[in-house]
Amino acid sequence: MARNRQPVLKKCRALGIDPVVLGVNKSSKRGPRPNANKKPTEYAVQLREKQKAKFIYNVMEKQFRKIYEEAARKLGVTGLTLIEYLERRLENVVYRLGFAKTRRQARQIVSHGHVAVNGRRVNIASYRVKVGDVISIIENSKNLDIIKTSVEDATVPAWLELDRAAFTGKVLQNPTKDDLDFDLNESLIVEFYSR
């Protein structure tokens, strides 16, 4: 399986992302790039927005394009549907429920089999949850320090519900753009793919 192994701070700096969005509490000591004051082209702005979404959600290009094409086929606004699909990925839901400090840690928790959806163990990070699904940590994994400490500090968005004592969460409704924890201009991504 292909994975992005670039240094997180370096990539955040290049894409203009605050590292706190990724759960990294560091900041780069380096100043702005020498050519940072050059006006980027329209293509460069669109590409950067797409790369930002891919990097934050930890999705490779082929999978991101499949998600976009699926969102484009569905009735409604393509950009908002794309955001909804990315937010409903299991690794992201585990992160948003507070079972992990970062999305990357959430991906590892899912792939190691610590998560169940509706009582069945799921180890596929890209699994898309639906409204009414119950996401829980399996019984043996509830004692893991990583999960315990993460749940204590969790702030859960309005589209999810968390039961801290039982280590379970429920999807109440589909996420919207307002539920994002970072700035994303989805229309630039749609423009990029519709060239």
Residue positions per predicted region:
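Ferredoxin-like alpha/beta domains used as RNA- or RNAP-binding modules
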Residues: 1-97, 124-195
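Short, surface-exposed recognition loops or helix-turn segments adjacent to catalytic cores
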Residues: 104-108, 120-125
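Short, well-ordered loop/turn sites that connect or cap secondary structure elements
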Residues: 100-103, 109-110, 129
